[in-house]
């Protein structure tokens, strides 16, 4: 397998001076939204003894369960994939007593790939798409 890329000219400002250099970047061939549940389920069904419908149901429930657990203040780690976590934020207040639940909110939900998962994925070769 290989990941398609294109070559684009971009500004390099690392030296303090603007310099145009060429870079390999993600191709627009990667569909926006990527592989959806149905396609993922079909692929997984071919590799396991489970039916596509069962896998789609599990994927759907997985999303709901992760959302529920994150909403309860838990982080969720899918072994081999990585953890899902939330970050909280609030506006600055003059005293600790002013930092009330109504002023604190989730600023983002993030995922950090498992190090082994990342290492293996980084071994994937890339394939240049001509101009």
Language-model region placement:
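Strongly charged
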Residues: 1-57, 61-131
């Amino acid at each position: 397998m290989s990941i398609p890329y294109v070559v684009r000219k971009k500004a390099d400002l690392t030296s303090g001076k603007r310099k145009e250099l060429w870079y390999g970047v993600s191709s627009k061939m990667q569909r926006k939204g990527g592989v959806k549940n149905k396609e993922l389920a079909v692929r997984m069904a071919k590799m396991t003894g489970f039916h596509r419908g069962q896998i789609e149901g599990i994927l759907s429930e997985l999303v709901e369960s992760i959302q529920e657990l994150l909403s309860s203040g838990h982080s969720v780690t899918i072994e081999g994939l990585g953890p899902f976590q939330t970050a909280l934020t609030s506006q600055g207040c003059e005293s600790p007593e002013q930092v009330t639940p109504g002023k604190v909110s989730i600023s983002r939900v993030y995922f950090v790939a498992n190090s082994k998962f990342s290492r293996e994925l980084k071994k994937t070769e890339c394939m240049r798409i001509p101009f």
